[in-house]
């Protein structure tokens, strides 16, 4: 038991525990209360609660002093009442921020900016609201490389960058159109395949190939590849990270779009048909056609400049689980109904279903409701199986579609409303604070002249007030607050 000595009215002496460890200032601050008036609704909290976040508007004594009403001995804010419950809970809970259900996102975002809760609180709020955190886009350290990187990677950064993006899109479209037109019969040159002529004078076979390098489509393709290669090499030179550059799917597509040209070029230059090698040349031509087919992937280069294609790619990526389930269900249905229709048509002499693998095509076409009609059941049992197959296909495809559509809507709205949300959650500016201060003043019962006098006195004396006095300003009520009268008198006398 601790025995108190001296004056029994001394609170410090009567405090239980070790008297040397007792801090009366801490106990004094713990008891101080702050009254905050939000558009007529009064809130009361302890000073130490607000002091947990000294960089915010309510936590900084100098910042909140601008809104002090000395006649009412309270802080007045002409702000949203319903939002302040969550703002005050932010201080009481140590940093947890939850938007009330009856407050819209834009209004609550404005309140966060006004009370200057900080970037960390905004990020936590965005995560709680379900916003996907935007990926950081590093820029090169070198100034020249940074300008080049912005020029080729971010079309919205400047006018020249927009022009380069337009040129790139036009070249991609020209390349795709050329790829399609060269297959038309009037443009197709069937002399690409090697042919031979027997020379009776030398008793040898001479192989000929077409003049590939004089083909107008080859010249047009060469011009497109020059631009693609130039663009790729410049972006590779200016990129901030080489490993990150080659890890990007879009850059891999760029490489895939360029490589077939050089493989084709090398094959044409190295091709020298000799006697007995006609079969190898035919095989080489087949491989070459497959390589040329890869050129069609250039169409994906448009996704670099198209938000719609990017949204589609994000939707497919987010819906991989649903797409996998769809393919799995289709696989089960194909096996089940192809087996059923085969045995249902087994006794039919003119049946088109000669085996279960032959019926796979019919099952896929029926379940996807395409119905080419090249394979049809003729027996009653086969028609029943076909009907069940079509119904099962409709149900199987329809089930995961709403989930995929929901993902698409999410990414679409996130992309279209991203800029507006970023503006709502942007940092508060000095002009915004001044405007909010004017609104707060206009809603007070004190006259304009009185406010000007009080504000002038606050501005002239706030820097001279010691920090410990700011902690015990007029609005705070304690068991023994000796600074209350002095500060009130100072503000009202000005």
UniProtKB/Swiss-Prot annotation:
Residues 1-25 are annotated as: Disordered. It comes from the Eukaryota. A lipid is attached at residue 239 (S-palmitoyl cysteine). Voltage-gated potassium channel that mediates transmembrane potassium transport in excitable membranes, primarily in the brain and central nervous system. Prevents aberrant action potential firing and regulates neuronal output. Forms tetrameric potassium-selective channels through which potassium ions pass in accordance with their electrochemical gradient. The channel alternates between opened and closed conformations in response to the voltage difference across the membrane. This is Potassium voltage-gated channel subfamily A member 2. Residues 182-216, 271-284, 343-356, 377-383 are extracellular. Residues 357-368, 369-376 dip into the membrane without crossing it. GO terms for cellular component: axon terminus; dendrite; juxtaparanode region of axon; plasma membrane; voltage-gated potassium channel complex. It comes from Oncorhynchus mykiss. Belongs to the potassium channel family. A (Shaker) (TC 1.A.1.2) subfamily. Kv1.2/KCNA2 sub-subfamily. It is a multi-pass membrane protein. Residues 1-159, 239-249, 306-320, 413-494 are cytoplasmic. Expressed in oligodendrocytes. The cytoplasmic N-terminus is important for tetramerization. Interactions between the different subunits modulate the gating characteristics.
